[in-house]
Curated annotation (Swiss-Prot):
It is found in: Secreted. The keyword ATP-binding does not apply. It comes from the Eukaryota. One of its GO terms (cellular component) is extracellular region. GO terms for biological process: defense response; envenomation resulting in negative regulation of voltage-gated sodium channel activity in another organism. Residues 1-66 form the LCN-type CS-alpha/beta domain. This is Beta-mammal toxin Co3. Expressed by the venom gland. Beta toxins bind voltage-independently at site-4 of sodium channels (Nav) and shift the voltage of activation toward more negative potentials thereby affecting sodium channel activation and promoting spontaneous and repetitive firing. This toxin acts on human Nav1.2/SCN2A, Nav1.4/SCN4A and Nav1.6/SCN8A voltage-gated sodium channels. Also, it reduces the peak of sodium currents in Nav1.5/SCN5A at all potentials. In vivo, is lethal to mice when intraperitoneally injected at a dose of 5ug. No activity is observed when injected into crickets or woodlice. Keywords: Disulfide bond, Ion channel impairing toxin, Neurotoxin, Secreted, Toxin, Voltage-gated sodium channel impairing toxin. PROSITE patterns: LCN_CSAB. Has the structural arrangement of an alpha-helix connected to antiparallel beta-sheets by disulfide bonds (CS-alpha/beta).
Amino acid sequence: KEGYIVNYYDGCKYPCVKLGDNDYCLRECRLRYYKSAGGYCYAFACWCTHLYEQAVVWPLPNKTCN
């Protein structure tokens, strides 16, 4: 599974500036999911890869980013 890492509180994606390989996104994806997850910056938000099927990613139901 893949998807944008999401803030559970406000429903927003984790923003990033440096597109492509990005240490911040990789670190955040691994902290949120687990160490075998990958992550990079895509369309100015952190995209996580190699997630388990039950992983919660953007968009969250009933939560819009404010």
